[in-house]
From Swiss-Prot:
CDD domains: ADK. Disulfide bonds: none annotated. One of its GO terms (cellular component) is cytoplasm. One of its GO terms (biological process) is AMP salvage. Keywords: ATP-binding, Cytoplasm, Kinase, Nucleotide biosynthesis, Nucleotide-binding, Transferase. Residues 30-59 are annotated as: NMP. ATP binds at residues 10-15, 127, 166. It catalyses: AMP + ATP = 2 ADP. It comes from the Bacteria. Catalyzes the reversible transfer of the terminal phosphate group between ATP and AMP. Plays an important role in cellular energy homeostasis and in adenine nucleotide metabolism. The gene is adk. AMP binds at residues 31, 36, 57-59, 85-88, 92, 129, 140. One of its GO terms (molecular function) is adenylate kinase activity. This is Adenylate kinase. It comes from Mycobacterium leprae (strain TN).
Length: 181
């Protein structure tokens, strides 16, 4: 099963991605982890990504796409994967479709974890990170909303919306149900 997880910061995507990956026996693929791993291994792509990250810039889409494409070449993705944090734009979604089309497959499901701005603020404040101020979080939520509007339309036939308010177990059960598991 090939699954994309969408949701604003603080929606619990990372937690649910990890749990779903364990339950389904497929890898969780996070772009943040891909950046870190490639930087640690000092790969060519990691070296390129590091330049942007060190400057505080976003890693360009084409470089992120290359990192994801390389990761999808690994044998553990043959039976599926959970993508967490990718794609973030329509351009990346189309690139992902091309990557999978070359492999004779496509996305099976897209889960959007929905949560209110008030809940996100409460959750992120609980993390205790200095950059989780109300203004920063609201800005990140607005960016997410603006970026993903076109993604939700693009994935409309595979999209399932998950109520991400509740305990981790409740949200996990909803996600499994949405996947027919």
């Amino acid at each position: 099963m090939r699954v994309v997880l969408l949701g604003p910061p603080g929606a619990g995507k990372g937690t649910q991605a990890q749990r779903l990956a364990e339950k389904l026996g497929i890898p969780q693929i996070s772009t943040g982890e891909l950046f870190r791993r490639n930087i640690e291994k000092d790969t060519k792509l990691g070296h390129e990504a590091k330049k942007y990250l060190d400057a505080g810039d976003l890693v360009p889409a084409d470089l992120t796409n290359q990192l994801v494409d390389d990761r999808l070449n690994k044998s553990d993705t043959v039976d599926g994967f959970i993508l967490d944090g990718y794609p973030r734009s329509l351009e990346q979604a189309k690139a992902l479709h091309e990557m999978l089309e070359r492999r004779g497959t496509d996305i099976d499901a897209v889960l959007e974890f929905r949560v209110s701005q008030a809940v996100v603020l409460e959750r992120l404040k609980g993390r205790g990170r200095a950059d989780d101020t109300d203004d920063v979080v609201i800005n990140r939520m607005n960016i997410y909303r603006d970026e993903t509007a076109s993604l939700l339309e693009y994935y409309s036939s595979e999209l399932k919306t998950i109520d991400a308010i509740g305990t981790m177990d409740e949200v996990f059960a909803r996600a499994l149900h949405a996947l027919g598991k």
